Curated annotation (Swiss-Prot):
Organism: Chlorobaculum tepidum (strain ATCC 49652 / DSM 12025 / NBRC 103806 / TLS) (Chlorobium tepidum)
The name this protein goes by in its record: Small ribosomal subunit protein bS18
NCBIfam families from the UniProt entry: S18 (TIGR00165)
Similarity comment: Belongs to the bacterial ribosomal protein bS18 family.
GO MF, one annotated term: small ribosomal subunit rRNA binding
Keywords: Ribonucleoprotein, Ribosomal protein, RNA-binding, rRNA-binding
Database matches in Pfam families: Ribosomal_S18 (PF01084)
Keyword rRNA-binding: yes
Coiled-coil residues: none
GO cellular component: cytosolic small ribosomal subunit
UniProt subunit comment: Part of the 30S ribosomal subunit. Forms a tight heterodimer with protein bS6.
Length: 74
C-alpha cells in the first residue's frame, strides 16, 4: 500500500536548483497566503534545497523584496 503523500511528492533528480533572492515570483510560489514558508513535505524539495530556499526567502524579506506577512494579516 503506497502512501498518498509519497505519490504526490515532486522529485527533483539531476536538476540544479538555485533560488535567487531577487526572483520575487519564484519565491512567492513557496510562501502561503499568510506569508509562511511552505514545508518540505508539501514542496517536495530535498533538505538541502529547502535550506537554500529558506535562506533566500529570509534574505529577500530582509531586503524588503517580499513582505514578512501578507497585507490582510497586518
Amino acid at each position: 500500500m503506497s502512501n498518498a503523500l509519497a505519490s504526490k511528492k515532486k522529485v527533483s533528480k539531476n536538476q540544479v536548483v538555485f533560488f535567487d533572492y531577487r526572483d520575487e515570483r519564484k519565491l512567492k510560489r513557496f510562501i502561503n497566503d499568510q506569508g509562511k514558508i511552505i514545508p518540505r513535505r508539501i514542496t517536495g524539495l530535498s533538505a538541502k534545497e529547502q535550506s537554500l530556499l529558506t535562506h533566500s526567502i529570509k534574505w529577500a524579506r530582509f531586503l524588503a523584496i517580499i513582505p514578512y506577512v501578507a497585507d490582510e494579516y497586518k
